[in-house]
Amino acid sequence: MAEHNEIGKIGENITKEFLVKQGFKILGQNYAIKQGEIDIIAEKDSTLYFVEVKSIKVRDCTNIENLVISPEDNLTLAKWSKLLITVETYLKHKNVPHETRYQIDLACVYIDTEMRQGRVKLLHNIYKEKE
């Protein structure tokens, strides 16, 4: 497995643990269609959360404020478009009622592989920011 794929999987696992500790119920992971993939699908307080995970390797995950690159930089317009299509497909495929509240969040994961730890910064409801 390529290192970036391995970092991505580690980031998804760290994010799942983070979400569970925050009271989320994990409904699924890596829901994929031809057009794209949703990394994590979760639920909390009657709201569905579609969580896109972007991870980067850092030397020190406790000091992320002055980094030149951040995980959210990896959410390109093309990836964003595919994510929106995949979310809409999921809602239809799973017959989710129209009145169900949902949002798309971005989990930015900073991974220190040497210290074997990570840090999650969760950006809420990025759909409004990207519209």
Model-derived segments and their meaning:
Residues M1-Q29:
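Acidic-basic catalytic patches of nuclease active cores, encompassing PD-(D/E)XK
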Residues A2, E6, I10, Q35, ...:
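Residues at secondary-structure transition points
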Residues L19, I40-N66, L83:
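Conserved catalytic cores of phosphodiester-cleaving nucleases, focusing on short active-site segments
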Residues Y31-I33:
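Mixed-charge, glycine-accented linear interaction segment located at domain edges/termini
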Residues D39-A42, C108-Y110:
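Conserved protein-kinase catalytic-loop segment immediately C-terminal to the catalytic Asp
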Residues L67-Y102:
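Mid-chain, well-packed structural core segment of small domains
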Residues K92-E131:
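Domain-level recognition of nuclease-like catalytic cores that cleave nucleotide substrates
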